[in-house]
Amino acid sequence: MAWISLEKAKKLEERFGYPKVSEGKGVLSVEVPKDKFIEFLTFLKEDPEYQFKMFIDLTIIDHGEKENPRFQGVVILFSPKNQERIIVKTWAENETLPTLTNLWKGAKWAEREAWDMFGIKFEGHENLVRMLLWETYPYHPLRKDFPLEGIKDTELPSLNETLRGENLEGLFNYDRMHTALPTMEDLEITQKKRMPVKTSQIVLNWGPLHPGTHGTIWFLFDLDGEYVKQCDIIIGQLHRGVEKLGENVNWQQFIPYTDRMDYIAAINENHAYVLAAEKMLGIEVPEKAKWIRTMMAELSRINSHLLWLGTYALDLGALTMFLYTFREREKIMDIIEGITGARFTINYFRIGGVFADLPYGALDAIEHLIKDLPQRINDYETLLTRNRVWLSRNKDVCVITEEDVYQYGLTGAVARGSGVPYDVRKIDKYDAYGEVEFDIPVGEKGDSYDRYLVRMEEMRQSIRIIEQCIAKLRKMSKDDPYFFQTPDEKKLKVTIDGRGMKLPAGETYASSDNPRGELGFYIYNKKDGLKAHRMRIRSGAFYNLQVFTKAIIGRPIADAITLLSTIDPVVGETDR
């Protein structure tokens, strides 16, 4: 990822006097005083030279109870004009920070998550409620003094004890005490706080277990007749504390957990994480591994988009399309299983390369697949693109503007559908993306129809990339390394007997362009360690979903299905 140059950052230091510039592992950050935070961010956003007008992420670092101030705010911004990023930090004195929502609307959910996980209050936030947990939950679990196993403060007798009166205390590791659980009253309080002021008497609950949401998402619609006047979303039903886990297992152990975020595109989740770890280590991945990873990532993108298209069409009544896309998707799943050994949670990428070389015949199977796939995509478009029903449900429906992209930090097909050619593969050129040729499809209006067309063209571009990867890999020897280093016997013994690799002190941010948008990992280490001091996961699905609450306003409730499908979130990644 291109980052602001040290020279330009030093100019900020000279201009304002107070910024402290520091270089991380391939990134650059600027620390400013809390009372100058908004002034400095406003300058970065509006100054013609810098124009950091796209919000990327906001998070918190807990430096531990002994530090004062203990918490530090971290903001990541992107300049579309200069194609570069910057990290801006400030200390959360008295455990408060000023809200960024007057500068970027996308900060609303990020600030709610920071309050939920760390207990940091944002002064001026319109409705600072919890983001992932229920409203009456008494703790802030990403604080360093909160144990990984939680705090057992709730008595929860077993069904055997409740129904039969059996005393199981001391048997089968049975423990009556459990971590906090929400009651129906807790959920009712949570629901009411999400929408404190209603404009009508009708509030429709959609989800969290509705087939149209494709996951545990709970929508609240304030309706005037069938038109939406106000909307909020309750997420977190699939929250598993993945960031907390990332700070409590070693670097290599965390890779399988990334599979379980966006489980539809597990390979792409692996990709973003290993890129961040490699950036921290400063290692160069072998050429063969770069091309394998690029090819597998694009196979995964097509696989994900086929699932999206089939379920999207099914939701709008086109059952046949669902059957067609799953026919092709099954072929891709078989290829992925043959290469990685798994169909769903892949765990194939490694820090420094891939787990294993391509098996015999893998390139032939992929080549056979992509030979037929362009015609299949053409067939899908013949059925849908000019279909009158499809046009009426998608054309001019739920428009997302270019300004929305910058305000909310929208990425992936959602951003590109609104005419913004934001693609991390082009900006960062990670792995083999700097050596392959492909185009970035963009929309014109930003409506649901444009987002559909962008994803259809993305599948064609992925095929182009895979063809180039196959041609390159065919020229490579079977003996070419697919991992950055083949350990000798002594090093292998150290790896087995030891506790894993150590990553150095410092900070970094790396991301990949996934089917759901930009998945980024911000890693901060106070010292060399086996585990991350802070591991932040920037979910593209999380930020993209936030714009739903704006784009649905004024639309009939039936358009909620269309909008949600063209945003295409996966709950495992939004909730983490």
Swiss-Prot record:
InterPro entries: NADH_Q_OxRdtase_suD (IPR001135), NADH_quin_OxRdtase_su_C/D-like (IPR037232), NADH_UbQ_OxRdtase_30kDa_su (IPR001268), NDH-1_subunit_CD (IPR026662), NDH1_su_D/H (IPR022885), NiFe-Hase_large (IPR029014). It is a peripheral membrane protein. Residues 1-176 are annotated as: NADH dehydrogenase I subunit C. Residues 200-576 are annotated as: NADH dehydrogenase I subunit D. It catalyses: a quinone + NADH + 5 H(+)(in) = a quinol + NAD(+) + 4 H(+)(out). The gene is nuoC. It comes from Sulfurihydrogenibium sp. (strain YO3AOP1). NDH-1 is composed of 13 different subunits. Subunits NuoB, CD, E, F, and G constitute the peripheral sector of the complex. It is found in: Cell inner membrane. Its EC number is 7.1.1.-. In the N-terminal section; belongs to the complex I 30 kDa subunit family. Keywords: Cell inner membrane, Cell membrane, Membrane, Multifunctional enzyme, NAD, Quinone, Translocase, Transport, Ubiquinone. Gene3D superfamilies: Cytochrome-c3 Hydrogenase, chain B (1.10.645.10), NADH:ubiquinone oxidoreductase, 30kDa subunit (3.30.460.80). NDH-1 shuttles electrons from NADH, via FMN and iron-sulfur (Fe-S) centers, to quinones in the respiratory chain. The immediate electron acceptor for the enzyme in this species is believed to be ubiquinone. Couples the redox reaction to proton translocation (for every two electrons transferred, four hydrogen ions are translocated across the cytoplasmic membrane), and thus conserves the redox energy in a proton gradient. One of its GO terms (cellular component) is plasma membrane. Pfam families: Complex1_30kDa, Complex1_49kDa. Transmembrane segments: none annotated. GO terms for molecular function: NAD binding; NADH dehydrogenase (ubiquinone) activity; NADH:ubiquinone reductase (non-electrogenic) activity; quinone binding. This is NADH-quinone oxidoreductase subunit C/D.
